[in-house]
Amino acid sequence: MSKGKIIVAMSGGVDSAVTAGLLMEDGYEVIGVNLRTWEYEAPACDTTKKSCCSPEDIRDARDVGISLKIPFYVIKMEKVFQEKVIDRFIEDYQHGKTPNPCVECNTFVKFGALFEKAKALGIDKIATGHYARIARNGERYAIANGIDVGKNQAYYLYGLSQENLKNVIFPLGEMTKPEVRQIARRMGLPVADKSESQEICFIPENDYRKFLEKKNVEFTPGFFKLKDGRIVGKHKGRENFTIGQRKGLGIAWKNPLYVISIEDDGSVILGEENETYNESFSVIDLNFQGLAPLNEGESLECRVQVRYRHIPIRCKITKMKEGLIVHPLEDVRGVTPGQSAVFYPLDSDYLLLGGIISKGSIQMRVAEPAISVLN
């Protein structure tokens, strides 16, 4: 007996292909869709084949559909992708932030817009090839870590709503990547041994600077400064830098220097290794999953992850009128505005909530006058 219809987002890779195959074996009527998010004549898709927006990947996804004998469609998502992902990506760099476009894509495109398309077709369920699981905490649903530590993608999925979480299936959450490839070979899927993309889909060769230049973004030049206000160099654009960066600064100093803050006036603040740790930071644009929304003034001890592959550390969070204040209870460095922070219970692996890192705790002392050491 059929379990009903389900839409599977198919990128052309092995993970989504196996997802479709497993759901078929489980009794679902699978409909495969590929999300067209980018204009294929654009350089971002002409210069690389390892991109989920490339024509090659659409053909691979279609070949999987033929192999599995399921319906397959390409859905146009260029407009929402431009507005919610690319425009925000550019805007964040223009404001001295380091964006995380994969989070925005999952929240607004792969799950937000795709769920709307599914509903319009009378289909409630969708599935993807993410390495994540669904957990319950009382009446609330939450993303939980996939068991493959090296592939776990929970960090990128904190933006899913309760309605999304009730109706999404992640068949790969209990599997490892080698197991997925083995299943693909058993199923005879044409992408069983296809290599993975490690790039942002619209950024060829991961060169975001070149992408910004092609979008005619004006870079903001300024000075390299120390925390005490001393000027130690010039740069051609704050957009070239991110928090924690050490290489490519071009500054000769007695000890290695790191980017610890990027200012609105174009100044890039540098510090030595012991100056890279954060005392507190704020998180905005919150989405609560396993935890019911906090009231202003409420506090909670939990764990925070401040970037992908960062091991969560203990912290105390306090709900403010706008977002949270986070006080780490263990050392953390390189907290970066524009990146996401996700929060876990102290003793479990499901997401309580997540949001965007707004502003670090670094306070810069301005020397009067600033002492220049430029040649």
Swiss-Prot record:
Which region ranges are annotated with the description Interaction with tRNA? 151-153, 307-308
Residues at which ATP binds: A9, M10, S11, G12, G13, V14, D15, S16, L35, G129
InterPro entries in the cross-refs: MnmA-like, MnmA-like_C, MnmA-like_central, MnmA-like_central_sf, Rossmann-like_a/b/a_fold
**Classification via CDD domains:** MnmA_TRMU-like
S-S pairs = C105-C201
The site feature described as Interaction with tRNA is recorded at H130, Q339
> In the UniProt entry, which residues are flagged as the active site?
C105 (nucleophile), C201 (cysteine persulfide intermediate)
Please name the SUPFAM superfamilies in this protein's record.
Adenine nucleotide alpha hydrolases-like (SSF52402)
The Enzyme Commission number assigned here is 2.8.1.13
Task: List UniProt keywords, sorted A-Z.
Answer: ATP-binding, Cytoplasm, Disulfide bond, Nucleotide-binding, RNA-binding, Transferase, tRNA processing, tRNA-binding
Listed under GO cellular component are: cytoplasm
Identification of the protein by name: tRNA-specific 2-thiouridylase MnmA
What organism does this protein naturally occur in? Leptospira interrogans serogroup Icterohaemorrhagiae serovar copenhageni (strain Fiocruz L1-130)
Q: What is the lineage of its organism?
A: Bacteria, Pseudomonadati, Spirochaetota, Spirochaetia, Leptospirales
